[in-house]
Swiss-Prot record:
Co-factor remark: Binds 2 [4Fe-4S] clusters. One cluster is coordinated with 3 cysteines and an exchangeable S-adenosyl-L-methionine.
Enzyme class: transferase
InterPro entries assigned: Elp3/MiaA/NifB-like_rSAM, Methylthiotransferase, Methylthiotransferase_CS, Methylthiotransferase_N, Methylthiotransferase_N_sf, MiaB_methiolase, rSAM, rSAM_horseshoe
Protein name, per record: tRNA-2-methylthio-N(6)-dimethylallyladenosine synthase
Assigned EC number: 2.8.4.3
PANTHER family named in the record: CDK5 REGULATORY SUBUNIT-ASSOCIATED PROTEIN 1, MITOCHONDRIAL TRNA METHYLTHIOTRANSFERASE CDK5RAP1
Ranges where the Radical SAM core domain occurs: 137-370
Ranges where the TRAM domain occurs: 373-433
Its biological purpose: Catalyzes the methylthiolation of N6-(dimethylallyl)adenosine (i(6)A), leading to the formation of 2-methylthio-N6-(dimethylallyl)adenosine (ms(2)i(6)A) at position 37 in tRNAs that read codons beginning with uridine.
Subunit structure comment from the entry: Monomer.
SUPFAM superfamilies from the UniProt entry: Radical SAM enzymes (SSF102114)
Length: 433
């Protein structure tokens, strides 16, 4: 019997990418589906959604409306992920042609969903047996691995605890075996995923070997054949000295750190319920630069959070100047349902929010130009992962710069030393040496 065709579109973060991989594995290995990039020939159309900001939620309904117009007769449409978790039955009301709704903590029920009319799975609790999935990887050379699920922080602007539930650490033996299996299949790099990875080990579903995130990094680095370990996202509150020292000194841990700032104002951080101050954040970031001079630090920043004054915004700009981030992900505050910030007084007007965002992004662009210029004539070890147009190939350095050289498919999955000859804001161009 010929395979049925599966089309899947993934929106949002790396955790969504991994969730999509899990669903692909279940469907291709257990239900006789094969992936297609042509939505018109698909028997099953999935969209894996994001709800961190309002825009992706609006995009969901425009996308599924488009799917309904082009799908072939008899094809099913499933809405999965975080927006599915928090909207639930409203999706059926607004898009009655959707066949099932599957929340972020219910992806293991995908085979049940495709067989049940108007199936809706939006629970945010987990049974530990659901940590074990069939396996599929979008990349041979890099493997995403969940180490925790959910979040206990309840930051006042964030909907994630309402869509992914409370934080649970995945048992070490499951993580280790998954990493080992990925390396046996050709992975050179593993990418550990969680809302707050460096809070690992604080809460397991049942009794398991006790270890913290630093211990986990050290244990995983013993896997023979594994060359690189990346992770996202750590929480600044849990960046103790042990963690920073393991990060700096373990040669397999990539020297790229995502440190979500959100705001440089201690008052706004308190209103956000982030748990740290501007002073704590700067202490940790500058300590990291001291321990690991070649580290690349990225961050998330929200401007125009309710009550943010010009002085508060200047505090954020001050952190930008002091830390000099290699990369920022910056956004205007987006009011999310179910969050405390949505009903806070002193919501900021759109004009002020746009001005602050432009000021932040423009200054960071200037800083980034200075940073990348200093990379010219340096030599980096690059893992090549992606073919580019014009007989080119791209990969990343240990500290996460994107590097492009002339090269062909035979370089995929290989490490090469590359000398940078022309540094641009988004890409470093170079030559293999």
């Amino acid at each position: 019997m010929s395979a049925k065709k599966l089309f899947i579109q993934t929106l949002g973060c790396a955790m969504n990418v991994r969730d999509s991989e899990h669903m692909i594995a279940e469907l291709t290995q257990k239900e006789n589906y094969a992936l297609t990039e042509d939505i018109k020939e698909a028997d099953l159309i999935l969209i894996n959604t994001c709800s961190v900001r309002e825009k992706p939620v609006h995009k969901l309904f425009s996308e599924v409306g488009g799917f309904e117009k082009v799908k072939k007769e008899g094809a099913k449409i499933g809405v999965c992920g975080c927006t599915a978790s928090h909207l639930g039955n409203e999706i059926f009301k607004r898009a009655p042609y959707v066949d099932f709704v599957l929340g972020a903590r219910n992806i293991s029920k995908i085979t049940q969903a495709i067989k049940t009319p108007k199936f809706m799975g939006v629970d945010i609790d987990y049974d530990e047996s659901e940590f074990a999935f069939a396996d599929f990887r979008n990349s041979i050379y890099k493997s995403y691995i969940n180490i925790s699920i959910g979040c206990d922080k309840h930051c006042t602007y964030c909907i994630v605890p309402h869509t992914r539930g409370d934080e649970i650490s995945i048992p070490f033996n499951i993580i280790y075996k998954e990493a080992q299996k990925a390396v046996e299949k050709g992975a050179k790099e593993i990418f550990l995923l969680g809302q707050n990875v460096n809070n690992y080990g604080k809460r397991f579903r049942n009794e398991h070997k006790k270890m913290d995130f630093s211990d986990l990094l050290e244990e995983l680095s013993t896997i023979e054949g594994l060359e690189r370990i990346r992770f996202t996202s750590p929480h600044p509150l849990h960046m103790d000295d042990k963690f920073l020292e393991v990060f700096a000194n373990n040669p397999k841990v990539c020297k790229s750190m995502h440190m979500p700032l959100q705001s440089g104002s201690s008052e706004i951080l308190k209103a956000m319920k982030r748990g740290y101050t501007k002073e704590w954040y700067l202490n940790r970031a500058l300590k990291l630069r001291e321990l690991c001079p070649n580290v690349s630090i990225s961050t998330d920043i929200i401007v125009a959070f309710p009550g943010e004054s010009e002085k508060d915004f200047e505090e954020t700009m001050d952190v930008l100047e002091k830390v000099r981030f290699e990369q920022i992900f910056s956004f205007k505050y987006s009011k999310r349902p179910l969050t405390k910030a949505a009903t806070m007084p002193n919501q900021i007007d759109e004009e002020t929010a746009s001005r602050r965002l432009s000021t932040l992004q423009n200054r960071h662009s200037e800083i980034l130009d200075e940073i990348v210029k200093k990379q010219e004539n340096k030599t980096f070890k690059v893992l090549f992962e992606e073919l580019r147009a014009g007989n080119s190939i791209a990969g990343r350095t240990d500290n996460n710069f994107l590097v492009q050289v002339e090269g062909s498919e035979e370089l995929l999955g290989q490490f090469k030393e590359v000398k940078i000859t022309n540094a641009k804001r988004m890409v470093l161009y170079g030559e293999i040496v």
